Structures are given as C-alpha cells and as structure tokens.
C-alpha cells in the first residue's frame, strides 16, 4: 500500500490490527485486478508484458474471483480476497460490481454526463467503500450509503488530479457535456494551450465531490472509533488533494498533486477530533440529490 496508495497508507495505520489486516488484503486484491487490466505491477510498467488481450485478462479475473466463493485459492491476491470475503460476509455482487469498473476501461466506455461518470466512480471506488465498511462491521444500508459516498468523492478527486495522465493513456472520465461547454474534446483536452479551460472542468469536478465528502462524514458514527479515525484521516487527505488541484489552476498537472508528511500528520490530528465529535454531532439526512448506489 505504501507504493500503490500513499494517500491511504497513513490512514490505514490507524485501524486496529485485525481490521488493518483485512483492509490490506482487500487492497491487495483490488490492486492486483487493476494491475492485471493495465498489464502493470503496482502501477508501474511490467517488464514482461502479457500476451493476453485486456478482454482475456478481464475474463480470467472474473473467473478467479468467482472461484473463491467455492474452492480454496492459492494465488495470493485471490486467497486474500477469499479470506476477507468469508470472514466479513462480503457480498459477491460487490466484487463483481468492482470488476465491472475495469470492464468499462477495457471496453473504452465514453462518459457523456456527470451521472455516467458517477456510475464509473461507483464501480471503481464506491463499491470498495461498501466492502471496506463491511470489514468494519457495518450492515445497515444508511451507513453503507455514506461509505459509498466517500468512495465516490475519492474517485472524483482522483479523476481531477489525474486528468492529463489519464488522457495520455487514452482514457477520459470527464463528462463529455462538460468538455463541450469549454470547447474541449477528449482528443485535445490535455493540450498545453487548453489548461486554463481544463482547470475549470477540474474545479467543477472537485466541487461536485464536496457534498459526497460531507455526506460521508455523517457515516463516521456508524464505525468503531479507531476505524472512524482512519476513515476521517483518509477523507481529509483526499479532500486536501482536490483543494490543491483547484488552487494550482492551470498548473495543476505540471506535477502530481499530493500532501506532504507534515500535512498528513496535521490532517491525522484534525481527523481524530472529527471522529470523536461525529459521535455527538447532529447529521442531516442524506440528500436525495446525491447519486444513489444500486441496491
């Protein structure tokens, strides 16, 4: 996790040992699936590229993910997922919802509207929030909705941060309707002369994430205190990255936006207070305007 997700690595240290083990095993499976689809190792180029097509690799992931529900697995990532799924009663549908997000990449899905982008965010991150919440003992739908909201917010932030990197890899998760409003297309959005217009799209995406971050905060009381602290820390770190993207404007993609170690520590301290006060604060009902996960 230190290599694959530095933003979440700090937060993960705050879980109790049992929860952290399960979280890391779930992460290992998610990371493995991502790497297999992209033919990478921990997000980096593979020295021995696969001879299979992306479609074939996706089919193998689906087959191997289905097997843990029935037989003993020996491949590390799938053995880890098997242990987590059985220990925490993770719904098989969640695992396949996650794989559906990779299928969207494989099939080069186009995203016309914000709703389309949010559907992608659900598959690659929102459903991971659901599985994480189940690891932490959550079973009620209201808290699961908030966990999904946090995943959506995380992915919206990731998309804003990685717009140019994704475009260079031939991927675009921005709503085409938003791009059209700025006179951009998926083919020219990463051109240096378009950075000012692109920064406005990124700002809009970060602003879209805000109500999902707020909604997620209302789910913290439904978690054990240490888990609430860990999740609040991750929430604050990712939100800070989105703020940096906005603050950097057209320069946001000159370097990868991230938080420094001192910033992470400050956010960790702030999150401890957030986790505690969330238990006595009044939380508004979840807004009907937010994207609703499939149930």
From Swiss-Prot:
Record has Manganese as a keyword: yes
Per the annotation, how and in what number is the cofactor bound? ATP is required for the transferase activity but it does not seem to be hydrolyzed during the reaction.
Keywords, A to Z, come to:
Carotenoid biosynthesis, Manganese, Metal-binding, Transferase
Pathway field of the UniProt record reads:
Carotenoid biosynthesis; phytoene biosynthesis
Cross-referenced PROSITE patterns: SQUALEN_PHYTOEN_SYN_1, SQUALEN_PHYTOEN_SYN_2
Q: How is its activity regulated?
A: Significant inhibition is seen at GGPP concentrations above 100 uM.
Q: Could you say which enzyme class this protein belongs to? A: transferase
Reaction equations catalysed: 2 (2E,6E,10E)-geranylgeranyl diphosphate = 15-cis-phytoene + 2 diphosphate
Q: Where are the transmembrane segments?
A: none
- What biological processes does GO assign it? carotenoid biosynthetic process
Q: Does the keyword Manganese apply?
A: yes
Summarize the pH-dependence annotation from the UniProt entry. Optimum pH is 8.2.
Cofactor(s) recorded for this entry are: ATP; Mn(2+)
Which CDD domains does this entry report, sorted A to Z? Answer: Trans_IPPS_HH
Functional summary from the UniProt entry: Involved in the biosynthesis of carotenoids. Catalyzes stereoselectively the condensation of two molecules of geranylgeranyl diphosphate (GGPP) to give prephytoene diphosphate (PPPP) and the subsequent rearrangement of the cyclopropylcarbinyl intermediate to yield 15-cis-phytoene.
The Swiss-Prot or TrEMBL record describes its family as follows: Belongs to the phytoene/squalene synthase family.
Q: What is this protein called?
A: 15-cis-phytoene synthase
Species of the source: Enterobacter agglomerans
């Amino acid at each position: 996790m230190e290599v694959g997700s530095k933003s979440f690595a700090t937060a993960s240290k705050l879980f109790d040992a049992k929860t952290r083990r399960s979280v890391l095993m779930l992460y290992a499976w998610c990371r493995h699936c991502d790497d297999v689809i992209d033919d990478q190792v921990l997000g980096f180029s593979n020295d021995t590229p696969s001879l299979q097509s992306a479609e074939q690799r996706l089919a193998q992931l689906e087959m191997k993910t289905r097997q843990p529900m029935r037989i003993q697995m020996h491949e590390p990532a799938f053995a880890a997922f098997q242990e987590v799924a059985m220990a925490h009663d993770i719904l098989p549908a969640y695992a396949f919802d996650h794989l559906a997000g990779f299928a969207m990449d494989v099939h080069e899905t186009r995203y016309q509207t914000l709703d389309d982008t949010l559907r992608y965010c659900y598959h690659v991150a929102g459903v991971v929030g659901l599985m994480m919440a189940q690891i932490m003992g959550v079973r009620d739908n209201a808290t699961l909705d908030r966990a999904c909201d946090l995943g959506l917010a995380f992915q919206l932030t990731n998309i804003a941060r990685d717009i140019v990197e994704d475009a260079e890899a031939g991927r675009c998760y921005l709503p085409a309707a938003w791009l059209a409003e700025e006179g951009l297309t998926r083919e020219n959005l990463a051109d240096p002369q378009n950075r000012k217009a692109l920064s406005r799209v990124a700002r809009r995406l970060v602003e879209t994430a805000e109500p999902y971050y707020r909604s997620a905060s209302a789910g913290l009381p439904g978690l054990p205190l240490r888990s609430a602290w860990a999740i609040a820390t991750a929430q604050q770190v990712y939100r800070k990255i989105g703020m940096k993207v906005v603050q950097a404007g057209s320069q946001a993609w000159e370097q990868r936006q991230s938080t420094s170690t001192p910033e992470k520590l400050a956010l960790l301290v702030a999150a401890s207070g957030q986790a505690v006060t969330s238990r006595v604060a009044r939380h508004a009902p979840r807004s009907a305007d937010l994207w609703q996960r499939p149930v």
